[in-house]
Amino acid sequence: MMNTNKVYNNILSNFNTDTLYRPQKDAAIVEGDSLELMKKIPSHSISLILTDPPYHSTNKKNITGDTKFKKDEDFLDWMEQFAKEWKRILKFNGSIYCFCSSQMEYQLINRFSKDFNILSTITWTKPNKPGFDGWRKKMKKENLRQWYPASERIVFMAPKYGENLFNSYFGAKLRSWRNLVKISGHDLTEITGAYGKVNHGGAVSNWEAGRNIPSREQYTKIINALKIRDTNGLISFPDYEDIIRPFNVDGTMQYTDIWDFETVRQYRGKHPAEKPIDLLENAIKASSYVNDIVLDTFSGSGSTAEAALSLGRKSISMEIEDKWVQASVDRLKSTQIELKV
């Protein structure tokens, strides 16, 4: 398995010490333009990207970058540059959660789908208790000329490796391994007992198409079956954590594509786009392994870093505004992180 501590420290060594802060051993904050900062990250070294870029459509002056682009196309071109870098730095089995507005969702997905498999589009409903509903309760309904945008979107995606929907790195590797040792998909299905009845598994054809991912037990059976045929030792098989995209949910989590997490209530010093810790934890727990590296390229006040630390992950936060860099440093230094793993 990849030595995550070594990878993490290697990544951080590439940044200027004047703009790098380490409020916790496993939490780093880098000040600057994340599009440029990402170029210093080695390829295929980040496990999960969880990030909240400017929405553009909301046009809020108190969010850096939200009013930067006059045309939608300029904003989309800018975001496409991020997508290219995200794919380069993500591990082959990495994932991305990218927040966006409902208005820009489809245009962004169109750009992202050039480099990523769009696995889900999550609707965050933002429910709140009476008295904390903001403009939803106060605004005059008769003035509406379209449905009130009470939700936000989160695009969940993984790097695409092929020309068809869902083509994945593992799927391509499995097919090449099978061809190398001359074992049919049907025979491998028989050996592993994966007939598609288990949602986490699916038949070999589904794994190769990228529609499903094998469980740890199924992957072990795959490797053992292939090793018997690989008499010349031609194949080096990665550990499960280095090739299978993590996706681990249970009944205690929000596991559908509708997420109901209350918004962060107003407090002195609150970031205008701050996301709730429990929502971020839901994504991190599902789509990363313990000790993985989580990157937020628009980190704001450091919520993603706090959520990552609480689940035993390492974090790298990139933020362009010095005000929020300092707020993040203070937050992570003073917050008592409760480990939830």
Show the residue positions of the predicted features:
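Conserved SAM-binding loop
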Residues: S328-V329
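Conserved phosphoryl-transfer catalytic core
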Residues: L76, K333-L339
